[in-house]
Amino acid sequence: MKHLFRGLLLVAVILCCNFQQAFAQQMPPIPIDKNVRIGKLDNGLTYYIRKNNLPANRADFYIAQKVGSIQEEENQRGLAHFLEHMCFNGTTHFPGDALKQYLERIGVKFGENLNAYTAIDETVYNISNVPVKTPGAVDSCLLILHDWSNDLTLDPKEIDKERGVINEEWRTRMSAMMRMQE
């Protein structure tokens, strides 16, 4: 009798688990704020613009690219992250250190207001707290976003300098256990 009861209980649990899957529903998408202007350029870039009054006379610029470590082949591991770093080391319109120098001159601090990250499926660059009343600041930030998406200079000297930065960043992120296992 005990075995029969356990068997029936096991069947009931399995059936409940299967029915739960049948009733699972996909969550509806998050609604887009009606104050967001959305458009698509001829080159396929989708943009989102929203006015924000706080902080006053400041703007944030982001470009999210649908590329990350998931697209890399084994012999390309770390390339997306490396290119993210190279975006700050020279573009067509901002050679060498000119991008960082210009933005810091108008009050955008590297690391705090000027940054990027690479994830599994995206690489996101941001310039925040840009003083919009500074002549040319908005146009320059849009030009920087353009350069980040299409016009890196990839100067061999800058590549060699950044290689050491990437290696050090990787080393410090590894846990002590991972280092011991190598």
Predicted regions and their residues:
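Mature N-terminal segment immediately following signal peptide/propeptide cleavage
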Residues: 29-63
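Residue-level signature of the cytosolic catalytic core of signaling kinases
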Residues: 28, 32, 41, 72-75, ...
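Bacterial N-terminal signal peptides
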Residues: 7-18
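Generic detector of short alpha-helix boundary/capping microenvironments
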Residues: 12, 31-32, 113
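Active-site-adjacent, His/Asp/Glu-enriched structural segments that form or flank metal-binding
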Residues: 55-57, 65-80, 84-182
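Positively charged n-region of N-terminal signal peptides that target proteins for export
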Residues: 1-6
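Boundary at the C-terminal end of the N-terminal hydrophobic targeting segment
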Residues: 22-24
